[in-house]
Amino acid sequence: PLYSSAASDVYKRQINAFSNANTVVSLANGNLGPSLVKELFKSGEILSLSNDLVKPFYKGRAHQALNWFREALVGVPYRIHQPEGAIFLWLWFEGLPITSQELYERLKRRGVLVVPGHNFFVGMDSEWRHQRECIRISYAQDSESVKKGIALVGEEVRRAFREE
């Protein structure tokens, strides 16, 4: 065999230890970031930065992503929620012949990460098809990566409908 079960146990312990350390580091933020922005909050300048820089930037990115989706999804039944300030879009592919989980798996193999919709319908009727026809996609990465990812989403969704 390529590795023994003893080695496998060592790897499992190492992975578990790394996972635990990552959880602690991710959940316990340091003091540097908060201390740097403390004055921005006290002075109210954080609001002008948000309204004058951050909000317009992501509004432009949202509109660009919407345009790329319009190009990538021609002929595909889809709807996109109205973006209202978040850094992601919700897409609904009505009648998608595969689940959003399968779409996620296909896209992941091609280097594109989306979030399958069913993860956001906790406690809902599991028979409701809509939850398996939606994905959430972020447009916060660099424009070229987002554009490429959107094109690949279009290819995979079109493929799913073709294979139906």
Predicted segments with their positions:
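Single conserved hydrophobic/aromatic residue that forms the stacking wall/gate
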Residues: P1-A7, Y11
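Short hydrophobic/aromatic beta-strand micro-patches
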Residues: S8-D9, W90-W92, S138-A140
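Helix-loop "lid/cap" segments that line or gate small-molecule binding pockets
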Residues: D9, S35-E45
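Structural signature of PLP-dependent enzymes
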Residues: A17-V25, S43-N67, L96
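Conserved glycine-rich beta-strand-loop-beta hairpin in the small C-terminal domain of fold type I
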Residues: D52-L66, Y78-F93, H130
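Short, conserved charged micro-motifs
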Residues: P97-L103, E144-K148
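PLP-dependent enzyme catalytic core of the Aspartate aminotransferase-like
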Residues: R109-R110, M124-E164
